[in-house]
């Protein structure tokens, strides 16, 4: 078998970064970038093995945030500013998981897009 070809992950030494939490009704995605926007690590509830409706739970967001934080701290990340987007259930639990992992949060910014009467929303569910 030929040896596996691919980029060897270079260990960067980054002290501060930006965490983007995209929380939808179906999933929670966490991306950790440096100051210029290069991705250091990422994780999501689906990537951590949650399937279907379990992806949208706060616990799945907590696991995904802890995983992304652990990967980023291998590169020397210590302080982060957080950008939260979306209406999902995993917003607060992802924030708590980041601080519990040992990252110092300096700023929390909510950039959830709010329409000024744009597209028609999906119809209401009748259960």
From Swiss-Prot:
PANTHER family, A to Z: 40S RIBOSOMAL PROTEIN S14/30S RIBOSOMAL PROTEIN S11
Coiled-coil ranges per UniProt: none
Top-rank lineage group of the source organism: Bacteria
A cellular component term, taken from the record's GO annotations: ribosome
Quaternary data: Part of the 30S ribosomal subunit. Interacts with proteins S7 and S18. Binds to IF-3.
UniProt protein name: Small ribosomal subunit protein uS11
Keyword annotations from UniProtKB, A to Z: Ribonucleoprotein, Ribosomal protein, RNA-binding, rRNA-binding
GO BP, sorted A to Z: translation
One Pfam match: Ribosomal_S11
MF-aspect GO terms: rRNA binding; structural constituent of ribosome
Gene expressing this chain: rpsK
Function: Located on the platform of the 30S subunit, it bridges several disparate RNA helices of the 16S rRNA. Forms part of the Shine-Dalgarno cleft in the 70S ribosome.
Gene3D superfamilies tied to this protein: Ribosomal protein S11
Organism: Anaeromyxobacter sp. (strain Fw109-5)
Leader sequence segment: none
Membrane-crossing segments per the record: none
Protein family membership: Belongs to the universal ribosomal protein uS11 family.
């Amino acid at each position: 078998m030929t040896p596996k070809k691919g980029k060897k992950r270079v260990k960067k030494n980054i002290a501060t970064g930006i965490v983007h939490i995209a929380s939808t009704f179906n999933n929670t995605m966490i991306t950790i970038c440096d100051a210029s926007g290069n991705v250091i690590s990422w994780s999501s509830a689906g990537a951590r093995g949650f399937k279907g409706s379990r992806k949208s739970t706060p616990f799945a967001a907590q696991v995904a945030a802890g995983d992304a934080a652990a990967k980023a701290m291998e590169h020397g990340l210590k302080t982060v500013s957080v950008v939260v987007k979306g209406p999902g259930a995993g917003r607060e639990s992802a924030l708590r998981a980041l601080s519990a992992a040992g990252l110092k949060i300096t700023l929390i910014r909510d950039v959830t897009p709010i329409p000024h009467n744009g597209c028609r929303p999906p119809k209401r569910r009748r259960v």
